[in-house]
Each structure stands twice: as C-alpha cells, then as structure tokens.
Swiss-Prot record:
Cell location: Plastid, Chloroplast
Family affiliation: Belongs to the chloroplast-specific ribosomal protein cS22 family.
Species per Swiss-Prot/TrEMBL record: Spinacia oleracea (Spinach)
Keyword Hydrolase assigned: no
Gene: PSRP2
Lineage: Eukaryota, Viridiplantae, Streptophyta, Embryophyta, Tracheophyta
Function summary: Component of the chloroplast ribosome (chloro-ribosome), a dedicated translation machinery responsible for the synthesis of chloroplast genome-encoded proteins, including proteins of the transcription and translation machinery and components of the photosynthetic apparatus. cS22 may have a role in the recruitment of stored chloroplast mRNAs for active protein synthesis.
Protein name: Small ribosomal subunit protein cS22
Signal peptide range: none
GO biological process, any: chloroplast rRNA processing
Length: 260
C-alpha cells in the first residue's frame, strides 16, 4: 500500500520538518494541512478541512452571581411547614379531627387538623397535629391555647420543629407527686415512650378503681424509662387487671403486667 510520504515529497508537504540532529523547532503551517486534505480523501483519512495555527482570541466574560443572603434563607426556612405545624397534646380522648379544627381555627387559618389514633386499639393517643397557613397563625394559636383547658384537661401546644420531650417537665413532676401508694399495685413493663400517666390510668380504669398511675421517668427529665405502676383499692382488682391486660397492646406495644 502506498503511503502519504511516498506520494508527497519531503520538499513539498514536509519540507519544514527538521532532522533529529537539527536544533531548530519544526514548523507546520495550515497551508500544508490543506494540501494534505486533498490527498487524504483517496485513503479514507479523516482530517479537518482547515486548522488555524493562530489560536483564536478568547473572549472571557465575567459572570456575576448574586448570593442569597443568610437572612433571606432563614426567612424562607422559617416559612416552611415545620414552622407552621403544631403539636397539640393532652387533649380529651373523645376529641375528633373536626372538633380539634373548630377549636384551633378560632385563632388562625388552618390547612390540616388531625388527631392521632392507636393503630391497634383505635383509641385516641390524646394528641394531634395542626398545620396552620402562616407562621403568624401558628404563633397566635400557641399564645392563645397553650396551657388552656379543653374538656377539663390542660393542653400543650408547641411548634413541632422545636425539640419536644412529649410533656412539660414541671407538669410531669407534679403528676408524679400525686401518685397514691397502695399495697395493691401492679408493675407495667414495655411501655411505649408516648404513654403518659393519664393514659396509663385511663387504660387500667376499665378493670377497676385506679388510685394512681405513674410512668417511671429519668429524674429531672420527662424521658420515659419504659415502665410504670398502677395502684388499686383491692387485691381482686389487681388480679383482674393482670388477667385482662397482661400482654395486651397499649400505644402499639405489647405490655407486661405483674404484681409489684
């Protein structure tokens, strides 16, 4: 097969190529490439039709980007759903979604109001969530409804993105101090973290006269230790509670009930 070098004499296309002993730099012009293109078609070579040896001028355009200020970012995030979503706790067990909406919407525009229910028993978990339309509405509801009474119960209203222990520590300590001791008492283990003293009392009241109910918590906090005690007025009620409620489900968890 014929080669390009055999067709094009050195003094033609490659006359400027230097020998290995030459100290001068090799020169190669765009005119040479144009000549080579005309011959390359017959050999199936793919060469660009023209290559400029003069590099084009680079046009550099400065692009100015506008940074979003931290204050505007904070403002945007504060208008997010988390800042408008309220936790409403310690509500009456018979309060439903519509009634919760009616109570809250007196103080601001609402998007969603929902009471939480236990998926196993279908009983109200005594708390719900309300999403307001604006942060201002949410703040107004907290101001007007937090620590007010509904159905004889003092409710707690907070923004959900604030860290919540589930209850106010002072309230929890006050409830614990009201626990009535009795020789007729049961131990309840494997309690869900959401179980409150009031919920525990209501759950066991179906099986006897409950004198006191207490979820054991880490001292100085409202963090549940996962167990509690319920006191009754008689031995018969203790036996009835153990027989009926041991291995029953409370707040989605199977509890253990034994004599304390």
């Amino acid at each position: 097969m014929a080669t390009i070098s055999s067709i094009l004499p050195c003094h033609g296309l490659l006359q400027h190529c230097s020998s290995s002993s030459s100290s001068s730099k090799p020169k190669f012009s765009s005119q040479n490439l144009v000549q080579l293109q005309s011959f390359s078609n017959g050999f199936g070579l793919k060469l660009k039709t023209r290559v400029s040896t003069n590099p084009p001028l680079l046009k550099v355009r400065a692009v100015v980007t506008e940074e979003t200020s931290s204050s505007s970012t904070a403002s945007s995030s504060s208008d997010g759903e988390g800042a408008r979503r309220l936790y409403v706790g310690n509500i009456p067990r018979n309060l439903n979604n519509d009634e919760l909406r009616t109570i809250v919407e007196e103080h601001g525009a609402i998007e969603i109001a929902e009471v939480m229910y236990d998926k196993y028993s279908g009983r109200s978990r005594r708390f719900g969530f309300v999403t307001m339309k604006t942060v201002e509405d949410a703040n107004a509801v907290i101001e007007k409804l937090n620590d007010t009474e509904i159905g004889g119960r003092k409710i707690k209203v907070n923004i959900t993105e604030k860290p919540l222990e589930g209850m106010d520590i002072a309230t929890t300590q006050a409830e614990d101090s009201q626990f009535v001791e009795s020789p007729y008492k049961v131990y309840i283990g494997n309690l869900a973290k959401t179980v409150t003293n009031e919920l525990l009392k209501d759950f066991f009241s179906e099986k006897g006269k409950v004198l006191g109910a207490k979820v054991q918590r880490t001292p100085g906090t409202s963090k549940s230790n996962g167990f509690g005690f319920v006191s009754f007025s008689s031995e018969e009620e203790v036996e009835a509670a153990i027989q009926a409620l041991n291995n029953s489900v409370l707040e989605g968890q199977k509890i253990r009930v034994n004599k304390a």
